[in-house]
Amino acid sequence: MTEQLPLALFLMGPTASGKTELAIRLRQRYPVELISVDSALIYKGMDIGTAKPDEREQQLAPHRLIDILDPTEAYSAADFRRDALAAMNEIVVQGKIPLLVGGTMLYFKALLEGLSPLPAANAEIRQQIEQEALTKGWSVLHDELQEIDPVSAARIHPNDPQRLSRALEVYRISGKTLTELTETKGESLPFRVKQFAIAPKERAELHRRIELRFDKMMEAGFEQEMRALYTRKDLHPDLPSIRCVGYRQMWDYLDGNCTLDEAIYRGICATRQLAKRQITWLRSWDNLTWLDSENIEQSLETLSEAIASDRDSCV
């Protein structure tokens, strides 16, 4: 008889849907340990604008994979999968259940399905690409990527040389586009996963929550946090960190491209668009149990029952 795989829980949902509150409540009942699945919460010094769990929340339920990088650094889905698997295994060794909480669907997908191994970096080809960029400009190289891999070109900004260079490098090494390779599934997740998504039933309620949260972030000092980042000479608006929702709009304000009120409005609109994309992902997700943001008690009971029934089946 083969040994049963360990249990892991996914708690997904759009931004401002109440994931953190629900996860903390669950940890107070069961031996779960939280792992953040959020491409913005990884950055140090970006606390208010990302709605990062505060000190009290972190004391109640410490989150792994928060504050692990400086905003100058990039982080891929492959990096996340590596770090999340390591954290999940540590939690299981402690006799507890990994609870993965967040809204970065690409990270959840990479963790669940695995990633096709990409070719290793080739210094000679990378140098060749950098030389071409010096003579032609990155915009010309972006046009080249658009021809061979329009999907990646749509995701990668012309002023993001690190990711643009890597996409071209992968194609020149392997003869396959980054999109082709990343769509190929890799090693599956060695866990029994129960998957949940939380969201309000009505879109208007989610919009209300998003606007309220943005207002609270401004009251908490988001502008001051943004100014501290803006004064750093090593940060610019084409970095993945500064492209995070809210931060890009506030950067435009500090650059003098719009008023503060306009930046807030654009930030709220961008957050709504993000939430719409997250819900679109989730609607096509298999084996998903939906929870209601407006009924946290019932959502907590549903999660609790899932853990209890799993324990009973293992006896």
Swiss-Prot record:
Quaternary data: Monomer.
Alphabetized NCBIfam families for the sequence: miaA
Cofactor(s) the record lists: Mg(2+)
Region of interest called Interaction with substrate tRNA, as start-end residue ranges on this chain: 38-41, 162-166, 243-248, 276-283
InterPro entries cross-referenced by the UniProt entry: Dimethylallyltransferase (IPR039657), IPT (IPR018022), P-loop_NTPase (IPR027417)
GO biological process, one term: tRNA modification
List of residues binding ATP: 13-20
Role description: Catalyzes the transfer of a dimethylallyl group onto the adenine at position 37 in tRNAs that read codons beginning with uridine, leading to the formation of N6-(dimethylallyl)adenosine (i(6)A).
Binding site for substrate: 15-20
Site entry (Interaction with substrate tRNA), positions: 104, 126
Similarity field: Belongs to the IPP transferase family.
EC number(s) reported in the record: 2.5.1.75
Coiled-coil region: none
A molecular function GO annotation: tRNA dimethylallyltransferase activity
HAMAP family in alphabetical order: IPP_trans
Catalytically driven reaction(s): adenosine(37) in tRNA + dimethylallyl diphosphate = N(6)-dimethylallyladenosine(37) in tRNA + diphosphate
Name of the gene this protein is made from: miaA
Protein name (record): tRNA dimethylallyltransferase
Keyword ATP-binding set for record: yes
UniProtKB keywords: ATP-binding, Magnesium, Nucleotide-binding, Transferase, tRNA processing
